[in-house]
């Protein structure tokens, strides 16, 4: 392995050990935000350190076996030592390739939690119903993958489903796993209201935004905001429908409008709405940067939220992700089993990064 890569790995290992020691400090243990942030940072490099340790152990084994060859005269022992060296060197090559991939530039948002927004788009009532189906799909995925989903805002549609649903997902590498869900999701099926058995095509849009943390400063001027309160129709508790607890915030420079009525008070709803607004503003900046990065094209496409990424074909029990040409069972996916698609998308992202790095 190149000396420059070895040096980088040694630096990462030193950083890892330093972070681990900080995790036991009383002031860190007492501060849940600092403890969580530090834990995420440790987790982000733990696989690199573990793989490098395995590589170094093999290096020691190879060295010991070679020293044995210098003094050993027994033919059988020599043969076994040579086999061990060969196997260890082969494994080392595998680990070397793995380490090169692990050292590829990381998306700085990959470890962040996310805010997800689903809207019924083209197709009227059927689009809203499909938006509800997608919401349930992600809910099931969270339950299966130790993720916490919290509903932030709901706008139920008269015919069922939602015109808009906004929710947060918290868990390990939530953004890394879900960032490629953004885009237009198309459904092909016979609506329950269809009397002639014709297949209709409808769409819902999904937007996945990293939830910003204390490390990111988003400047929002008071004069750029209009804050309206209105009577909630959500699940906020006893105050629902009796007080103006729901909050809507309009950001004049961008035209972004966010609302929240799922909290138990106006103050809580305002805080949640500001969280959503900050994530939306941060996401706008990300989209601008991604549109300038040619290597991001295949998975993120043009970067536009209007790009069709996936089709859910009910008559044929098939879901197809158009960016990677991957198809699987629709029933399987709608039950929340998204991981095979997610893994294929992450593999494609890895291939793009390798091509960019010239490895």
Swiss-Prot record:
<keyword id="KW-0488">Methylation</keyword>
<comment type="similarity">
    <text>Belongs to the prokaryotic/mitochondrial release factor family.</text>
</comment>
<dbReference type="InterPro" id="IPR050057">
    <property type="entry name" value="Prokaryotic/Mito_RF"/>
</dbReference>
<dbReference type="Pfam" id="PF03462">
    <property type="entry name" value="PCRF"/>
</dbReference>
<dbReference type="Pfam" id="PF00472">
    <property type="entry name" value="RF-1"/>
</dbReference>
<protein>
    <recommendedName>
        <fullName>Peptide chain release factor 1</fullName>
    </recommendedName>
</protein>
<keyword id="KW-0648">Protein biosynthesis</keyword>
<dbReference type="GO" id="GO:0005737">
    <property type="term" value="C:cytoplasm"/>
</dbReference>
<dbReference type="GO" id="GO:0016149">
    <property type="term" value="F:translation release factor activity, codon specific"/>
</dbReference>
<dbReference type="InterPro" id="IPR005139">
    <property type="entry name" value="PCRF"/>
</dbReference>
<dbReference type="InterPro" id="IPR000352">
    <property type="entry name" value="Pep_chain_release_fac_I"/>
</dbReference>
<comment type="function">
    <text>Peptide chain release factor 1 directs the termination of translation in response to the peptide chain termination codons UAG and UAA.</text>
</comment>
<keyword id="KW-0963">Cytoplasm</keyword>
<feature type="modified residue" description="N5-methylglutamine">
    <location>
        <position position="238"/>
    </location>
</feature>
<dbReference type="InterPro" id="IPR004373">
    <property type="entry name" value="RF-1"/>
</dbReference>
<dbReference type="InterPro" id="IPR045853">
    <property type="entry name" value="Pep_chain_release_fac_I_sf"/>
</dbReference>
């Amino acid at each position: 392995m190149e000396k420059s890569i070895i040096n980088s790995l040694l630096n990462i290992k030193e950083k890892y050990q330093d972070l681990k020691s900080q995790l036991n400090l009383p002031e860190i243990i007492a501060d849940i935000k600092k403890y969580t942030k530090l834990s995420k940072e440790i987790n982000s490099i733990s696989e690199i350190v573990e793989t490098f340790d395995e590589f170094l152990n093999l290096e020691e084994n190879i060295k010991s076996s070679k020293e044995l060859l210098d003094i050993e005269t027994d033919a059988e022992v020599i043969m076994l030592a040579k086999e061990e060296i060969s196997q260890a060197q082969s494994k080392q090559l595998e680990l070397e390739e793995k380490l090169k991939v692990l050292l590829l530039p990381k998306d700085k948002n990959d470890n962040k939690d996310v805010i997800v927004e689903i809207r019924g788009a083209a197709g009227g009532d059927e689009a809203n119903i499909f938006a509800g189906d997608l919401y349930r799909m992600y809910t099931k995925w969270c339950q299966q993958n130790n993720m916490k989903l919290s509903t932030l805002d709901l706008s139920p549609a008269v015919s069922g489903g939602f015109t808009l649903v906004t929710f947060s997902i918290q868990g390990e590498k939530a953004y890394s796993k879900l960032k490629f869900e953004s885009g237009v999701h198309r459904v092909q099926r016979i609506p329950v209201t269809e009397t002639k058995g014709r297949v209709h095509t409808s769409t819902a849009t999904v937007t996945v935004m990293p939830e910003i943390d204390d490390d990111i400063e988003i400047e929002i001027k008071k004069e750029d905001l209009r804050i309206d309160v209105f009577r909630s129709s959500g699940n906020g508790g006893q105050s629902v429908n009796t007080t103006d607890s729901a909050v809507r915030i309009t950001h004049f420079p961008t035209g972004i409008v966010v609302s929240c009525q799922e909290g138990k008070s106006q103050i809580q709803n305002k805080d949640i709405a500001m969280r959503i607004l900050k994530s939306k503003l941060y996401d706008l900046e990300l989209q601008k940067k991604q549109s300038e990065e040619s290597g991001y094209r295949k998975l993120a496409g043009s970067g536009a939220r209007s790009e069709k990424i996936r089709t859910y074909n009910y008559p044929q029990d098939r879901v197809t992700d158009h960016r990677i040409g991957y198809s699987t069972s629709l029933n399987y996916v709608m039950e929340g089993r998204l991981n095979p698609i997610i893994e294929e998308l992450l593999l494609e992202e890895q291939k793009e990064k390798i091509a960019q790095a010239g490895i």
